[in-house]
């Protein structure tokens, strides 16, 4: 909960006369990724999120829920972070990754995740390490974390 409060905000919105709320995760262009138990979407503009703390290693995640899972596991200590917020944003992330000597990818174990990993590897070769191999039986890092501690982690019951 503390981790989500550090990086996320509650976004209230109205759609067709009804009031809704979602967890919002800001990108570098001031758009938001939005999540609630019934909705997954975003506000424009769509972009990556980059936490630049002048480290030589960068962790790369497809979405902010995996990023928050990595924060819980303390994987992001002493690293910079790029959250793609969609694999379609890989073109926006590649120039940012130039500055890093090690690029640790925590991408999804699906075709889109593998294709994204392949694009990063094509651009940066041996600087790229695939960490999705550490959770081969799970779709993503968050699903792996939920499997590791099912009573402590619930993807949809975050409250602010």
Give residue ranges: language-model regions:
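TOPRIM metal-binding catalytic domain and adjacent DNA-binding surface shared by DnaG-type primases
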Residues: 1-20, 156-160
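TOPRIM fold recognition
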Residues: 72-160
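Phosphate-handling DNA/RNA-contact segment within nucleic-acid enzymes
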Residues: 9-96
